[in-house]
C-alpha cells in the first residue's frame, strides 16, 4: 500500500438483499464469461463491470471498468476510467494486475510504484 485514505464509507444506499445479490451475480457472471480470458490468471475471485462512454463518431470511446474482490467478502474495489481506451473490457487486464499485486505478498517492496505514478 502506497497511501491509505479514509476507509469509512461517505454514504450508503438502501438496497434490498435480493437486488444486491442480482448485481453481484451479474458482475461475477461477467468475470466468468466475457472477461474470463482476462481473469484466468487472477489470484482472487472477483466481480466486475465494464462501461463504454461514447464521445463522437470520429473518436475512440472512453473506457470504464470497476471490480471488487474477493467476491464473497469484498476487501478492495478498483475503478479505472481512461479516455479513448475504446471499451471498458480493454481495461480488465490492468485491473487484474492491480488485484494480483494487492493480494500477492511481495517481499521486495522496493518495486512499489509511488503515488500518482503509472503502473508498469
Question: Predicted regions span which residues?
Answer:
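Residue-level preference for non-acidic, small/hydrophobic
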Residues: 23, 49-51, 66, 78, ...
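Short amphipathic C-terminal alpha-helix that caps PH/PH-like domains
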Residues: 94-102
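Short, Gly/Ser/Thr-enriched beta-strand-loop segments that form substrate-interacting elements
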Residues: 40-70
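Conserved active-site-proximal loop/helix segments of enzymes involved in bacterial cell-wall
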Residues: 1-35, 39, 104-120
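Short alpha-helix boundary/capping segments
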Residues: 15, 83-91
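Short conserved micro-motifs at the rims of enzyme active sites and ligand-binding pockets
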Residues: 57-60, 79, 89-92
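Short, well-ordered beta-strand elements
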Residues: 74-84
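Hydrophobic (often cysteine-bearing) scaffold residues that line and stabilize catalytic clefts
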Residues: 19, 91, 95
Amino acid at each position: 500500500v502506497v497511501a491509505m485514505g479514509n476507509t469509512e464509507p461517505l454514504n450508503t444506499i438502501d438496497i434490498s438483499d435480493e437486488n444486491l445479490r442480482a448485481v453481484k451475480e451479474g458482475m461475477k457472471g461477467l468475470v466468468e464469461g466475457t472477461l474470463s480470458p482476462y481473469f484466468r490468471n487472477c489470484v482472487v475471485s472477483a466481480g466486475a463491470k465494464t462501461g463504454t462512454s461514447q464521445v463522437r463518431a470520429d473518436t475512440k470511446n472512453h473506457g470504464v471498468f470497476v471490480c471488487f474482490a474477493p467476491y464473497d467478502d469484498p476487501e478492495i474495489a478498483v475503478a479505472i476510467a481512461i479516455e479513448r481506451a475504446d471499451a471498458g473490457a480493454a481495461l480488465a487486464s490492468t485491473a487484474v494486475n492491480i488485484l494480483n499485486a494487492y493480494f500477492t505478498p511481495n517481499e521486495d517492496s522496493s518495486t512499489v510504484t509511488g503515488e500518482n505514478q503509472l503502473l508498469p
